[in-house]
Amino acid sequence: MIWQQKTESAETETEDSGVAIPEVVIEPKEIPDTDGMKFVRDMKIGWNLGNTFDAITNAQKEDDLSIEWSWCGEKTTKEMIDAVKAAGFKTLRLPVSWHNHVSGDHYTISEAWLDRVQEVLDYAVDDDMYVILNIHHDTDKEYCYPDKEHLEQSLSYMTFIWEQLADRFGDYDEHVIFESINEPRLVETDHEWWLDMNAAECVEAVECINEWNQNFVDVVRKTGGNNATRYLMVPGYDASADGVLNDKFVLPTDTAENEGKILVSVHAYIPYHFALQAATENESIDQFNASEKTSTNDIDQMMEKLYAKYISNEIPVVIGEFGARDKNGNLQSRVDYAAYYIAAARAYGMSCNWWDNNAFTGDGELFGLLDRKTVTWRYPKIVDALMKYAE
């Protein structure tokens, strides 16, 4: 996600008395008995440290560490990550934007920034959590842009960044997962969020992303050590399901001994009109009922397609981002959504990561669950619903 508004935390939890977690029964699919599928199963459910290390600025910062809390308003603490683990989350997705913190032709990352990222990563590793580390909001023409004109530039940037990250985190075991890039897309075009495979520029973008992903795998594997066998995640165009379901998307090749260690990354805030669209926009809806097909159909169809193309063919899938924004206190619908989404994902053999941007007030993308100021769960019933079906 790209929402940048910093919101103030309220002092008390949202009242959720009278809200019930629905009973959801989805017949589980046959999941291949492979190490990769078991690995994703063990990731259980994850939580995104959103609007934090992924924050970016157009201004020069004397203290670039302050960017960490410039969007979310709070510096990350061990107490926060401990609370995430205690709630039952087993994976931390750690989105990081790097371009405000690099210098020189080889994009040398600021030691202070890299140290701070590692410090927070260690909070989760010390809690025996999985951590997904990525390149996040570096998706523009100066850094990573998926067209042929910028292909060489993009490959250069990603190579130098991933060489440094692979070196810094190479001694960590498989609990640390590398994700090539976040939501690669044609920024500021009509196709930014709408992939049209009849458009030449979209086909070209998909082909460039294929090259990025292959280069990412090659660069990481080449560094050896634990990186030679580390689990790696790769997205398609804008990390959408369509981005990996179209015929032009190609999964990177890997060494024979690493079969099943490339994880397909998908972001899916669906159904869109409920989960992501602003409440003030036309066609936005604020109701979701886990027992009604009209609510669940988009989720069912996406899961089925991902299962058919990937899971059934022993290729693991991770939903790197999902969630439903608060729309004027529609808590019961969000609880229904959380329960159904996770129940479906687990039945189809996938793990999911809720996008939490610490946003609770205003008219922006209100995906916050953990109030980072008070380190309390503002919507414990949503968390309970996620955990009930994540096993």
Locate each region found by the language model:
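Aromatic-rich peripheral "rim/lid" segments of glycoside hydrolase catalytic domains that contact
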Residues: 22-25, 329-391
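Short, acidic/polar
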Residues: 68-85, 158-160, 299-306, 335-338, ...
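An active-site-proximal structural segment forming one wall of the substrate-binding cleft
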Residues: 27-28, 71-92, 102, 106-137, ...
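Active-site region of glycoside hydrolase catalytic domains
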Residues: 155-293, 304-324, 347-350
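N-terminal carbohydrate-binding accessory modules
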Residues: 11-91, 309
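Surface-exposed, active-site-proximal loop segments in enzymatic domains
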Residues: 58-66, 98-115, 139-154, 186-201, ...
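Acidic/histidine-rich helix-loop elements
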Residues: 49-76, 104-109, 150, 273-299, ...
